[in-house]
A protein has these predicted regions:
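Extracytosolic ligand-binding ectodomains
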Residues: 1-271
Length: 271
């Protein structure tokens, strides 16, 4: 069963309750870190396993998940370090950050800032925008006032254009921008109506290690994808999330507690 609901916490919990009522013992998701954090207690209480392919918030390492939660994407503590290293390699000495005000955005912004400052850089400002905002001019103006060498944008598609369009109008796209996985989409410039204005933008995103497994996955995916593309952001991790639960269920049993008991073993060995 696939469930997509509104953004409010009530709808998030209802989405999970819907699949639990259908007898689900394992759930692949949620996609957004904030959503998973909002519904994890519900899953734990129902003894239903959640495995997310795209939750990257560092917050998950700090909470007790009772064994019923796992993720196949790395923490943004790693991405923050990689992004900071990229900035330093490019000679950036000062940076300003504009980010979503949620667990994903704050976690990645803080991780990036800490790593960049540890490497000798200076963070001019971090500006957070509300996740349900529809107008971002004041936030864009604030991040531009920092006068930094570069700007980091930690955004989602539904808000990314709202940030980039006023940035274009204010001439801020002449400053180097570094984006993250939330807007890793080759069609972003077209979606935002910005033509070639985003050419040259750089960024970071979780990926998969090169090798036979990655090549085999991309070949198989290309055969069934509508446009023949070999993959998309978090697609390999989504496959891994489903297979992780399936392998554990096959070895231990199909109830939530049985699946949970074998997640660590199922993810060991590298095969």
């Amino acid at each position: 069963s696939f469930v997509s609901r509104g953004l409010g916490d009530v709808y998030k919990r209802q989405s999970l309750n819907d699949v639990i009522a259908q007898g689900a013992q394992g759930v692949m998701g949620a996609a957004c870190s904030g959503t998973s954090l909002a519904i994890l207690d519900t899953a734990i209480a129902a003894e239903v396993v959640m495995v997310s392919p795209s939750n990257t918030s560092p917050q998950f390492t700090k909470i007790d998940k009772k064994g019923f939660y796992a993720r196949t994407a790395p923490s943004d503590l790693l991405q923050g370090d990689v992004l900071a290293s990229l900035l330093v390699e490019d000679g950036v000495q000062t940076v300003s950050i504009i980010s979503r005000a949620d667990s994903y955005g704050r976690g990645l912004a803080e991780a990036t800032a800490a790593a960049f400052e540890a490497a000798g850089g200076t963070v001019k400002t971090i500006v957070y925008h509300a996740t349900d905002a529809s107008e971002f001019t004041s936030e864009v103006t604030a991040v531009g006032k920092g006068g930094a060498d570069a700007i980091v944008g930690i955004l989602f598609p539904e808000t990314g254009c709202g940030v980039l369009q006023p940035a274009f109008e204010q001439g801020l796209l002449d400053t180097p921008w570094y984006m993250t996985d939330g807007v890793k989409d080759a069609g972003l410039a077209s979606l935002c109506g910005l033509g070639t204005a985003l050419d040259g933008f750089k960024g970071t995103a979780p990926g998969s290690a090169a090798g036979e497994a990655k090549d085999a996955f991309e070949a198989a995916y290309a055969e069934v994808s509508a446009d023949g593309s070999p993959t998309f952001i978090f697609a390999p991790q989504a496959y891994d999330a489903v297979m992780l639960m399936a392998i554990s269920a096959a070895a231990n049993g199909v109830t939530g507690p049985e699946i949970a008991s074998g997640l660590v073993a199922a993810s060991s060995g590298g095969e």
